[in-house]
C-alpha cells in the first residue's frame, strides 16, 4: 500500500515584495484640503491625509517607504497622526533623485504619490528607466500630462485621487500594488512507502 501526499503550491502572497512607497513631501503638500468632515474647523493638509491613508491601508503595512522633496530618504514608519501634524513639507519635487535613491536601495517597482510636476521631466524620465511605477496624483486639476506619460513609459499605472475623499486615495493605493506573486509550486509528487 502506498501512502502519498500531494504537494500543494504555497498560497499566493498579497505582500508587495519588491515594491516600495514613494511619498511626495515637497512644499505644496502643506496646502490644506477643504473638508466637510472637519470636526474642529481645522482643514487637514495634503500631507496629513497622505500619511493617514497609508497608515489606514492594511496592504501598505510592512512596505518600505521613502519620502522625497529636494532629497529622498527611507523612513522606518509612517508618521503617527500626532507626528504628522508637526511635519513641515518643504522643497521641490526632485523625482530624478527619488528614483535614483529607491533603485540604489534595490526597488524597481514603486507606488509614487505626488501632487505636482517634477523639477525636470527629462531627468525624471531618464532616472525611471528600468522601473515600474504606480502613480497616484493627489493635486488640483489639471493633471500634469507628464505623470501619465511617465506611467506609460514605465509600463505602470496612473490614478487620480480626490483628497477631499480619503477613501479614494486608500483605494488607489490598493489598486497600485503589484498583483500577488506567482510562486513556483514545490517539485515532487507522491511519497511512496
What are these model-predicted stretches?
Residues 1-14:
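Negatively charged sequence features
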Residues 16-19, 27-65, 87:
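…and closely analogous acidic/polar surface helices at protein-protein or active-site interfaces
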Residues 17, 61-62, 106-108, 131:
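Short coil/turn segments at beta-strand junctions that form active-site/ligand-binding loops
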Residues 19-21, 112:
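Residue-level marker for buried hydrophobic side chains located in beta-strands
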Residues 24:
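Residues that scaffold, gate, or flank divalent-cation-dependent active/transport sites
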Residues 51, 64-121, 138-148:
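Von Willebrand factor
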Residues 86-89, 116-164, 170-174:
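VWA/integrin I-like adhesion module and closely mimicked acidic/polar interface patches used
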Residues 164-193:
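C-terminal "exit" segments of structured domains
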Amino acid at each position: 500500500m502506498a501512502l502519498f501526499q500531494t504537494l500543494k503550491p504555497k498560497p499566493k502572497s498579497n505582500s508587495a515584495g519588491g515594491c516600495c512607497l514613494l511619498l511626495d513631501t515637497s512644499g505644496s503638500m502643506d496646502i490644506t484640503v477643504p473638508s466637510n468632515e472637519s470636526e474642529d474647523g481645522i482643514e487637514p493638509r495634503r500631507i496629513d491625509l497622505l500619511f493617514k491613508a497609508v497608515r489606514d491601508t492594511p496592504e501598505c503595512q510592512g512596505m518600505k517607504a521613502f519620502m522625497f522633496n529636494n532629497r529622498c530618504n527611507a523612513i522606518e514608519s509612517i508618521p503617527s497622526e500626532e507626528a504628522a501634524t508637526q511635519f513641515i513639507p518643504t522643497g521641490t519635487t526632485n523625482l530624478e533623485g527619488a528614483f535614483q535613491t529607491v533603485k540604489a536601495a534595490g526597488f524597481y517597482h514603486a507606488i509614487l504619490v505626488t501632487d505636482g510636476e517634477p523639477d525636470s521631466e527629462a531627468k525624471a524620465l531618464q532616472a525611471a528607466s528600468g522601473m515600474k511605477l504606480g502613480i497616484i496624483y493627489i493635486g488640483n486639476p489639471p493633471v500634469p500630462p507628464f505623470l501619465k506619460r511617465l506611467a506609460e513609459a514605465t509600463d505602470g499605472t496612473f490614478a487620480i485621487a480626490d483628497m477631499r475623499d480619503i477613501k479614494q486615495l486608500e483605494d488607489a493605493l490598493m489598486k497600485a500594488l503589484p498583483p500577488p506573486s506567482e510562486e513556483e509550486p514545490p517539485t515532487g509528487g507522491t511519497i511512496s512507502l
